[in-house]
Amino acid sequence: MSRIGKLPISIPAGVTVTLKDDVVTVKGPKGELSQYVNPAINVAIEDGHITLTENENAMLDNPKQKHAFHGLYRSLVHNMVVGVSEGYKKELELVGVGYRASNQGNIIELALGYTHNIFIQLPPEVKVETKSERNKNPLILLESCDKQLLGQVCSKIRSFRKPEPYKGKGIKFVGEEIRRKSGKSAGAK
């Protein structure tokens, strides 16, 4: 039995959870999310808690897979409950001379030192806001109820100009430490 999977998930006020045909649907003030759950895992909703247990009758190729599924689906359902009740936020920082970001609705325009600007169409579930103050690095603020989708969008934006180790220029998460390298040593033989 998975240690993470054993923990029950408490359902906060204003959130409703339904189970139909191995699909868990969570509705809350921030939105609605659905997740398919493998038949090897049983889902029970009772007394304001969601509990996931391993189905002893389920046959899988590898018995260890059932333990892995137990922890995986518990984490996915927990992320859905937190997402629809509180939401998830991530901040990206653009470090570099002339790096800019602006948004029109759900389209981000990035100026990252290339000969052309980059336009990124975001999914409707992700809300975006850009901040740029004088003498500070521009910020991209992203918010969504779907943690997985938010991570994918942030990763896609970051992939256009990953931070480089010599000067630290690029797109990074706020608070992320970039491992720096020293340049060429002068006169090294």
UniProtKB/Swiss-Prot annotation:
Single GO term (MF): structural constituent of ribosome
Keyword Ribosomal protein assigned: yes
GO cellular component: cytosolic large ribosomal subunit
Domain of life the protein comes from: Bacteria
Alphabetical list of InterPro entries matching this protein: Ribosomal_uL6-like (IPR000702), Ribosomal_uL6-like_a/b-dom_sf (IPR036789), Ribosomal_uL6_a/b-dom (IPR020040), Ribosomal_uL6_bac-type (IPR019906), Ribosomal_uL6_CS (IPR002358)
Keywords: Ribonucleoprotein, Ribosomal protein, RNA-binding, rRNA-binding
Cited Pfam families: Ribosomal_L6
Glycoprotein recorded as keyword: no
Gene3D superfamilies assigned: Ribosomal protein L6, alpha-beta domain (3.90.930.12)
GO BP: any one term: cytoplasmic translation
Residues in coiled coil: none
Known function: This protein binds to the 23S rRNA, and is important in its secondary structure. It is located near the subunit interface in the base of the L7/L12 stalk, and near the tRNA binding site of the peptidyltransferase center.
Matching PANTHER family: 60S/50S RIBOSOMAL PROTEIN L6/L9, LARGE RIBOSOMAL SUBUNIT PROTEIN UL6M
HAMAP family per record: Ribosomal_uL6_B
Quaternary structure note: Part of the 50S ribosomal subunit.
Family named by the database record: Belongs to the universal ribosomal protein uL6 family.
Name listed for the protein in its UniProt record: Large ribosomal subunit protein uL6
Record organism: Bacteroides fragilis (strain ATCC 25285 / DSM 2151 / CCUG 4856 / JCM 11019 / LMG 10263 / NCTC 9343 / Onslow / VPI 2553 / EN-2)
